[in-house]
Amino acid sequence: MVGHAIHGMIALGGRSRRGSRVTPTPDSTLADAQQTIADLRRELAESEPQKAAMAEVLGVINSSPGELSPVFDAILEKAHTLCGASHGVLATYDGEHFRAVATHELPTPFAELLRRPFPPEPGGPQEQLLRGERLFHAPGASVLTGPGGDTPRTRAAREAGQRAFLMLPLRKDGRLLGYITANRNEPGPLSDKQIALLENFAAQATLFE
């Protein structure tokens, strides 16, 4: 055996090791297949509510030709349901002012305040979106005070019980058309999957601008 390579052993002289190949056992192959099937079933189950929500939005579009208000209402409501958001708005931007065109589960005074045109607050979330930020995510209570101090909108948010805040832009061809928010009454971040869902609905909203 001296002078001959021995498979499965470490070669002398610092050469690389050659080992026997491990052949998957029937049990491991079956377990992998079962895990793959389980993953596919879970993904399918998770996608079904989104498909159903999109179908309902399409139904609203078909039943309200030329009317954008019910379409925006439907997009916002379905997005919040899937993301587990308590309340929020869908707002448009005319180049100078923002204005909510749909609100969901907001106290009436707060909703009316956001429906009035307002400029972006210096350093605020809307201004950050104008600078090109992908999103503004404030999972804690610090969102209740803006960088410029209290404003009528931040006070109304506090009175509405808002404790977590996510704002996503509505963009088309690089131009900011507005934003959509998903807010919660308990502190804590939205997951990447929930943010991705909201981005999908934001993309749908830009089709009607």
PLM feature spans:
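A short, aliphatic-rich beta-strand micro-motif
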Residues: 163-171
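Short beta-strand-to-loop transition segments that serve as allosteric relay/switch motifs
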Residues: 106, 179-188
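Regulatory sensory and allosteric helical modules in signal-transduction proteins
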Residues: 109-148, 155-158, 166
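Signal-transmission linkers at sensory-effector interfaces
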Residues: 21-70, 81, 193
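Short hydrophobic/glycine-rich mini-motifs in sensory/regulatory modules
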Residues: 170-180
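Short regulatory alpha-helical segment in sensory/regulatory domains of signaling proteins that mediates
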Residues: 49, 58-66, 75-84, 89-92, ...
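GAF sensory/regulatory domain recognition
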Residues: 76-80, 88-122, 131-135
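Allosteric cytosolic regulatory segments
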Residues: 199-206
